[in-house]
Design a protein with these regions (language model features):
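Cytosolic-side membrane-entry/anchor segment at the start of a transmembrane helix
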Residues: 1-40
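Juxtamembrane cytosolic face of transmembrane helices
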Residues: 2-12, 83-96, 110-113, 120-182
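Hydrophobic, aromatic-rich alpha-helical transmembrane segments
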Residues: 3, 7-11, 15, 61, ...
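Alpha-helical transmembrane spans of integral membrane proteins, capturing the lipid-embedded, hydrophobic core
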Residues: 14, 18-22, 26, 72-80, ...
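Alpha-helical transmembrane segments of polytopic integral membrane proteins
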Residues: 21, 25-28, 78, 91, ...
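Membrane-helix interface segments in multi-pass membrane proteins
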Residues: 26-76, 131-152
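FKBP-type peptidyl-prolyl cis-trans isomerase
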Residues: 101-103, 176
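Short, acidic, Ser/Thr-enriched surface-loop or helix-capping motifs
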Residues: 105-107
Length: 182
């Protein structure tokens, strides 16, 4: 059985991931907001040209701005989900890879794709539910996503215990270990 990685290294890997996610989100947000601002300005110009009396009233434009912000938020959420999907395909996030860690099954062998998908969905339940809430236009997913997300967040601190397993690892029978060749 391989040595399980404790809370400290896992937290360091997560910190690395967060830096990458912030950079990725910032780049995406910057391009998206620039594009949407150009679009919004074109709509305002068109509105002012078609009806000068409505030039000072941008109610429709404000609604468009809210829709644009929602789109940007969803784009960022999708980017984060995509970034962390490396855990499914590579058995580790970028932060874990940089620190020479991997996700394994409970006895230290390679984790199955099913276990990695389950772990991913549990770990990112809040973001997955936010996307579902947007797609079906109901707040129920958002509420339960927040609730389960909070439980999983608290469960991350289980990795500081003797078994070095977070709640999502316990539920999916996975552990985080040092790679053999690292």
């Amino acid at each position: 059985m391989e040595k399980r990685i404790g809370f400290g290294l896992r937290l360091a890997a997560f910190a690395i991931d967060i830096v990458f996610v912030w950079i990725l989100s910032g780049i995406i947000s910057r391009f998206a907001t620039t594009f949407m601002a150009v679009q919004a300005q074109a709509q305002v110009d068109e509105l002012m040209a078609s009806n000068p009396l409505l030039a000072g009233m941008y109610t429709g434009e404000m609604l468009n701005m809210v829709v644009s912000v929602t789109r940007i938020s969803l784009i960022v959420i999708f980017a984060r989900l995509l970034y962390f999907s490396t855990e499914i395909f590579l058995g580790a996030s970028v932060g874990k890879l940089l620190l020479g860690l991997k996700i394994a099954n409970a006895d230290g062998g390679n984790a199955s794709v099913g276990a990695l998908i389950g772990r991913y969905l549990l770990k990112h339940v809040k973001r997955v539910c936010t996307v579902l809430a947007f797609l079906v236009l109901t707040g129920v997913f958002n509420f339960f996503g927040s609730l389960f997300g909070f439980v999983i967040f608290i469960g991350c601190f289980f990795a500081a215990g003797d078994r070095h397993q977070a709640l999502h690892d316990m539920m999916c029978h996975t552990i985080v270990v040092k790679k053999e060749n690292a």
